[in-house]
């Protein structure tokens, strides 16, 4: 599962996801991509589940690029522990995803397989998504 090797601080504030994605909104590697439509934190487990679903549908042909990385530590306190006594330990890592962000890109498979693979990958994610395709160089179009 994805997680940072080293961070400046062990714990972070929760934060909010405001507005649309500032970068990562165009296809850079593949011919098809999965674009976020709403803001959400995506956990490392969800990213891995989506990657596996996409790879399985593609029957290990072509190539998959993961364009998001879980760099936000999410903490939690154990069950039946009273409030206070500091912030809990890091439970898992998440990626903040804003609307418009390309999360996955794929290439090297036929159109119908690519769309089905991304649809199955999107089912593993907690947000609404849209499949985008490369019409001309560097431009993501709604599919």
UniProtKB/Swiss-Prot annotation:
GO cellular component, one term: cytosolic large ribosomal subunit
Keywords: Ribonucleoprotein, Ribosomal protein, RNA-binding, rRNA-binding, tRNA-binding
Molecular function (Gene Ontology), one example: structural constituent of ribosome
Entry-linked InterPro entries: Ribosomal_uL16, Ribosomal_uL16_bact-type, Ribosomal_uL16_CS, Ribosomal_uL16_dom, Ribosomal_uL16_sf
SUPFAM superfamilies in the record: Ribosomal protein L16p/L10e
Keyword Transcription in record: no
BP term (GO), one: translation
PROSITE patterns cross-referenced by the UniProt entry: RIBOSOMAL_L16_1, RIBOSOMAL_L16_2
Job description of the protein: Binds 23S rRNA and is also seen to make contacts with the A and possibly P site tRNAs.
HAMAP family: Ribosomal_uL16
Family of the protein in this entry: Belongs to the universal ribosomal protein uL16 family.
Subunit structure: Part of the 50S ribosomal subunit.
Name of this chain's protein: Large ribosomal subunit protein uL16
Lineage, broadest ranks: Bacteria, Pseudomonadati, Pseudomonadota, Alphaproteobacteria, Caulobacterales
């Amino acid at each position: 599962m994805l997680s940072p090797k080293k961070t400046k601080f062990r714990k972070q504030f929760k934060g909010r996801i405001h507005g649309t994605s500032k970068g990562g909104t165009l296809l850079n590697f593949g011919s098809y991509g999965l674009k976020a439509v709403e803001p959400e934190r995506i956990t490392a487990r969800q990213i891995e589940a989506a990657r596996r679903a996409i790879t399985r549908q593609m029957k290990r042909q072509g190539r998959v690029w993961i364009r998001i990385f879980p760099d936000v530590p999410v903490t939690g306190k154990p069950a039946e522990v009273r409030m206070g006594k500091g912030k809990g330990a890091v439970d898992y890592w998440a990626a903040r995803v804003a609307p418009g962000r390309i999360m996955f890109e794929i290439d090297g498979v036929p159109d119908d397989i690519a769309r089905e693979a991304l649809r199955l990958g999107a089912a593993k994610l907690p947000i609404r998504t849209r499949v985008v395709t490369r019409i001309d160089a560097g431009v993501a179009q709604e599919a």
